[in-house]
Amino acid sequence: INGNIISAVKVSPYTSHLVYFGTDNVSAAGCRLVKVANANAAITETNISAGLPTAATVSCINTGTNDNNLIVCFSNYGIQQIWISTNGGTSWTNIDGDLPDMPVRWCMFAPGDNTKAIIATEAGVYLTQLINGGSTAWIPSPTFPTVRTDMLQYRSSDGIVAAATHGRGLWTQPILSL
């Protein structure tokens, strides 16, 4: 996308043929976040990067309970890493709060709840019980190892969250025990 390499993709689970793309920051313009409508035909591309960091790589994009609720995270040091939108990417709010300065590799809202989030970081899994802008309080998960974690997935059939780590394997926990 405009000279950048795609680093994250999210297909909307709510709207047919709607896809979000995040990029790295190799171009002079820095990283981008793009919403593509009509991905199966004559696409409509909308840059939804305004207000987001440019000196980083988009590591993950996820939706909440609808396409208006978005969470995006960045992988770099010295930047604000986690952002949410409640209006489909028109505007963004940083929710780093008290999170240490480290890359965030994956982010997701808690299933069915846009006020809670779970993230995978350079130092393990963190969660918040209340997204509250710059006052968001992040807690390291006691049930996952303190090691670089690259991806999280939620399995709705049994309420399990899986965390893929770098060097410690795959860990699972019920969402309620996080």
Enumerate the language-model features and the residues they cover.
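Conserved blade-ending motifs and adjacent loop-strand segments that build the rim/top face
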Residues: 2-6, 53-58, 96-108, 136-156
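Residue-level signature of beta-propeller blades and closely related beta-rich strand-turn architectures
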Residues: 25-26, 39, 76-77, 123, ...
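A short loop-to-beta-strand structural motif that recurs across blades of beta-propeller domains
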Residues: 30-35, 81-84, 124-126, 169-171
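Conserved Ser/Thr-centered positions that define the repeating blades of beta-propeller domains
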Residues: 36-38, 64, 85-86, 92, ...
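Beta-strand initiation motifs
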Residues: 40-46, 89-93, 133-139, 178
